[in-house]
C-alpha cells in the first residue's frame, strides 16, 4: 500500500484514540468524586451533642410509658404537653387536642404577628406610637396592665415589652391597632396565621386573651404557635427578659417592667417561689375560665424541653399562700425528665462498623470503616430496664453506585454513611470513614486500569469504530482499485489494438515498398 494511502488511516486512528482517553479519564474522575459526596448537615458537631432525630409528628420519645406512669398522678392540670424542643417528640401528653381557654397565652400570637411585621419592615421598633382613645375599652376589673394612659406615647418596642413581660392587655390593643389599623383586622390576621401554622382547634376573638366564648385553643395548637414564635430572635429575647425599663413618657415617669414568669423572675409580681435556673420564657396566663396557664422552656445538659400547661389549679397551702398548679406541674415535669433522661452515645466514633472491599490494595483487599463522629441522642438513663437495640443501616457509596472502592485510601477518607434508627424513627446519620490507610499495589493498579480501559464501554465503542473504519477503508481501496482497473483496461486494449494496427500498417507498407522496387529486392 502506498504511503499516501496509509497516512489518512493513521490520522483517523490517532484522533479516535485521543478522544477515548479524556472520556475514560472523565468517567474515572466521576467515579472517584461520587465515592465522597458532601457531608450531610445533620451530623452532630464534635463534642457538642445535637438532636438529629427525624421523627414523625406525634411520635413519643423512647421510654415515654415510664414518663406517663411517673407523671400521671403527679400532674394536676387539665392539659399538659411536654416536648423535646429539638426533635419535636413527646415526653408526656394529656388532653392536648381538647378545647381550652388560653388567657394571656394569646399574647404569644400577638407578639409573633408584631415581630413578623417588624421583620417585614411594615413597622419599626423605634416608631413612636400613641395609645389611642379606646385602648382600654374591653378591659375587665383586675385585668393585668402596665398603667398605659390614653394619649401616652412610647416606642413600638416598649409597647411590645409591656404586652409580653407585664402581660398588659391595653398594650396588646395598641399593638394590634398599630400593626393592622384596627383590632378586628388584627384578630382576623391572628386566625389566618393560626391556620397557616396548622392549628385546627383555635379561634381568637381578641389580641390579649380576656374571656370570650369564641376565644379558645388547644395545647397542641399553642405548641405550634410557640414553636414558630421562638424561631424569631426578637420574640425569644423579649419573652426571656426579666426586667425592662420604659423611659419617662409624655404622661408617665420612668417605669420598670417585671416579668410575670416566676420560673425566670424570682421577684415576679404574681408567681414567686418558682424560680428555676434552667428555664427560659415564655408566657403566663390566668382567668377564672382558663385556670392557671404557663408555657415555658428549659435546658439542662443539652436536653431542651418545652412545656405547656393549661387549666392548672390554685391550691391553698397551710401557710396561707397559694400553690399555682401551672408552675408546680411544670417544675415536676422538668425535674423528672432531667433526672431520668440525658444525652447517650448510640454509636461511637471508635466503633468498627464493617469491612468494605477494596481493589488494588497492597496488603489486603478490604478496609475497616468507622463513624466519623459519635452519634448521640436524648435517651432514658443508662440504668433503665430494656435498653433499646438500635438498627444500623450502612450505605457504602461505591457499592451503591456500582463502582468498586480503589486503593490508595487514607484513614479518614469518607466511604459511606450510617443511619441509626429505632422503630422507624431515625436518631442520627453520620459519615463512615476509613479506619486505616490502604496502600496501593502499583502493578495491580496499572494492570487493572489497563484492563479497565480496554473494557470500558466508551473505549470498546471507539475500538469498534476504528475496526469498522479500517474495514471500510480496505473495502474502499479494493473498490477504488477495481474502478481504476475498469477504466484502464479499455484504454490498454485500445492501445494494444492501435499498436497492432500500427505494426500491421508498417508491415503492409514494407511489402508495398518491396513490390515497387523489384530490383532492389533481387539485389538483396
Predicted regions: what they are:
Residues 482-524:
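Cytoplasmic C-terminal tails of single-pass
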Residues 6, 36, 51, 363, ...:
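Positively charged, low-complexity intrinsically disordered regions
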Residues 4-24, 465-474:
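Sec-dependent N-terminal signal peptides of Gram-positive bacterial secreted proteins and lipoproteins
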Residues 26-220, 224-233:
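Active-site-adjacent loops and short helices of periplasmic peptidoglycan-processing enzymes
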Residues 199-200, 213-216, 220-465, 469-491:
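Domain-terminus/edge residues, biased toward the C-terminal soluble/receptor-binding domains
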Amino acid at each position: 500500500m502506498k504511503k499516501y494511502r496509509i497516512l489518512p488511516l493513521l490520522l483517523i486512528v490517532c484522533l479516535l484514540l485521543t478522544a477515548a482517553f479524556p472520556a475514560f479519564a472523565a468517567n474515572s474522575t466521576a467515579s472517584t468524586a461520587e465515592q465522597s459526596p458532601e457531608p450531610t448537615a445533620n451530623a452532630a458537631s464534635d463534642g457538642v451533642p445535637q438532636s438529629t432525630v427525624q421523627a414523625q409528628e406525634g411520635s413519643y420519645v423512647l421510654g415515654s410509658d415510664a414518663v406517663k406512669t411517673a407523671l400521671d398522678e403527679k400532674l394536676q392540670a387539665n392539659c399538659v404537653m411536654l416536648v423535646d424542643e429539638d426533635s419535636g417528640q413527646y415526653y408526656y401528653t394529656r388532653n392536648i387536642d381538647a378545647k381550652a381557654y388560653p388567657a394571656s397565652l394569646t399574647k404569644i400570637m400577638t407578639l409573633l404577628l408584631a415581630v413578623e411585621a417588624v421583620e417585614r419592615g411594615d413597622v419599626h421598633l423605634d416608631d413612636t406610637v400613641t395609645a389611642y382613645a379606646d385602648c382600654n375599652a374591653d378591659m375587665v376589673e383586675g385585668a393585668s396592665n402596665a398603667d398605659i394612659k390614653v394619649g401616652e406615647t412610647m416606642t413600638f418596642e416598649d409597647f411590645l415589652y409591656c404586652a409580653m413581660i407585664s402581660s398588659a392587655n391595653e398594650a396588646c390593643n395598641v399593638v394590634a391597632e398599630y400593626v393592622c389599623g384596627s383590632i378586628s383586622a388584627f384578630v382576623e390576621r391572628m386566625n389566618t396565621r393560626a391556620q397557616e401554622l396548622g392549628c385546627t382547634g383555635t379561634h381568637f376573638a381578641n389580641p390579649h386573651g380576656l374571656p370570650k366564648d369564641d376565644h379558645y385553643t388547644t395545647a397542641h395548637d399553642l405548641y405550634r404557635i410557640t414553636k414558630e414564635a421562638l424561631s424569631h430572635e426578637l420574640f425569644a429575647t423579649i419573652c426571656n427578659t426579666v426586667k425592662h425599663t420604659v423611659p419617662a413618657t409624655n404622661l408617665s415617669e420612668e417605669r420598670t417592667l417585671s416579668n410575670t414568669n416566676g420560673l425566670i423572675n424570682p421577684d415576679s409580681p404574681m408567681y414567686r417561689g418558682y424560680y428555676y435556673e434552667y428555664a427560659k420564657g415564655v408566657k403566663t396566663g390566668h382567668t377564672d375560665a382558663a385556670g392557671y396557664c404557663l408555657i415555658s422552656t428549659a435546658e439542662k445538659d443539652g436536653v431542651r424541653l418545652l412545656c405547656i400547661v393549661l387549666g392548672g389549679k390554685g391550691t391553698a397551702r397551710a401557710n396561707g399562700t397559694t400553690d399555682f398548679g401551672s408552675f408546680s406541674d411544670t417544675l415536676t415535669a422538668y425535674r423528672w425528665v432531667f433526672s431520668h433522661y440525658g444525652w447517650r452515645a448510640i454509636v461511637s466514633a471508635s466503633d468498627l462498623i464493617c469491612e468494605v472491599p477494596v481493589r488494588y490494595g497492597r496488603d489486603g483487599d478490604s478496609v475497616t470503616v468507622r463513624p466519623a463522629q459519635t452519634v448521640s441522642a436524648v435517651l432514658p438513663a443508662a440504668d433503665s430496664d430494656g435498653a433499646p437495640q438500635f438498627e444500623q443501616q450502612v450505605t457504602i457509596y461505591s457499592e451503591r453506585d456500582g463502582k468498586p472502592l480503589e486503593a490508595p485510601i487514607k484513614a479518614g477518607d469518607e466511604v459511606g454513611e450510617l443511619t441509626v434508627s429505632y422503630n422507624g424513627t431515625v436518631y442520627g446519620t453520620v459519615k463512615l470513614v476509613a479506619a486505616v490507610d490502604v496502600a496501593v499495589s502499583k502493578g495491580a493498579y496499572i494492570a487493572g486500569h489497563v484492563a479497565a480501559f480496554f473494557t470500558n464501554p466508551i473505549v470498546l465503542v471507539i475500538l469498534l469504530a476504528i475496526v469498522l473504519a479500517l474495514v471500510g477503508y480496505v473495502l474502499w481501496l479494493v473498490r477504488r482499485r477495481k474502478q481504476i482497473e475498469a477504466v484502464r483496461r479499455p484504454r490498454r486494449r485500445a492501445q494494444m489494438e492501435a499498436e497492432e494496427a500500427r505494426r500491421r500498417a508498417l508491415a503492409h507498407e514494407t511489402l508495398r515498398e518491396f513490390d515497387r522496387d523489384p530490383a532492389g529486392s533481387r539485389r538483396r
